[in-house]
């Protein structure tokens, strides 16, 4: 089964593709239907979606990671899971931030979570869950140079939080997502980026030179 695809890397001209998967697929992979897989196999998908704040930040953003959680409907159910990329996150380029590594966890009935290795061949019970997360994409270029309008779109799409927009991209908003009033505060954004840029230079790195 293939229910999710890891996020693709940013490039000098574009953000990473959410449906990138691996280079040989080039975004053209057909993902399984959750409903059909649930009809064919003794399991239920509890959640499937992108992971907020997982993407590698940059002038062009890497694609966010995707996460799926599922449980068994019978006792026991065998699962075989390959999960590469748990130790070396996708790298950012030219000042872009690294993406986040993949992971697989077993969740017991009491909520206790156990991290699983790269390759798993095991049985799970009806009261257990598997949570798998793909890698996200690394960013390209310094985040402080990203178009604030793109950061706003990312926040509205749920790819980036308002906190990450402020702390990493230096973009400040007014309004709220809930009532469709979220907007870029241009003056506050200019001041915030100047503040973050000054702090970066103090640490020995100049975004303007990248």
Predicted regions: what they are:
Residues 1-209:
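Glycine/proline-enriched, intrinsically flexible loops and inter-domain linkers
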């Amino acid at each position: 089964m293939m229910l999710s695809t890891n996020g693709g890397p940013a490039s000098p001209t574009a953000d990473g593709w959410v449906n990138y998967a691996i280079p040989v697929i080039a975004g053209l992979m057909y993902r399984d239907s959750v409903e059909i897989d649930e009809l064919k196999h003794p399991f239920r998908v509890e959640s499937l979606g992108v992971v907020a704040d997982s993407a590698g930040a940059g002038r062009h953003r890497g694609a966010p990671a995707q996460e799926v959680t599922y449980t068994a409907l019978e006792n026991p159910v065998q699962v075989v899971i390959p999960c590469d990329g748990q130790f070396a996150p996708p790298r950012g380029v030219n000042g872009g931030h690294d993406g986040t590594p993949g992971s697989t966890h077993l969740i017991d009935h009491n909520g206790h979570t156990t991290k699983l290795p790269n390759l798993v061949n095991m049985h799970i019970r009806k009261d257990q869950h598997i949570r798998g997360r793909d890698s996200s994409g690394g960013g390209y270029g310094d985040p402080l140079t990203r178009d604030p309008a793109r950061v706003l779109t990312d926040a509205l799409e749920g790819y980036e939080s308002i906190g990450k927009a402020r702390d990493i991209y230096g973009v400040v908003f007014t309004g709220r997502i809930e009532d469709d009033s979220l907007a870029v505060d241009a003056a506050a954004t200019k001041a915030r980026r100047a503040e973050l840029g000054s702090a970066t230079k103090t640490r020995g790195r100049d975004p303007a030179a990248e």
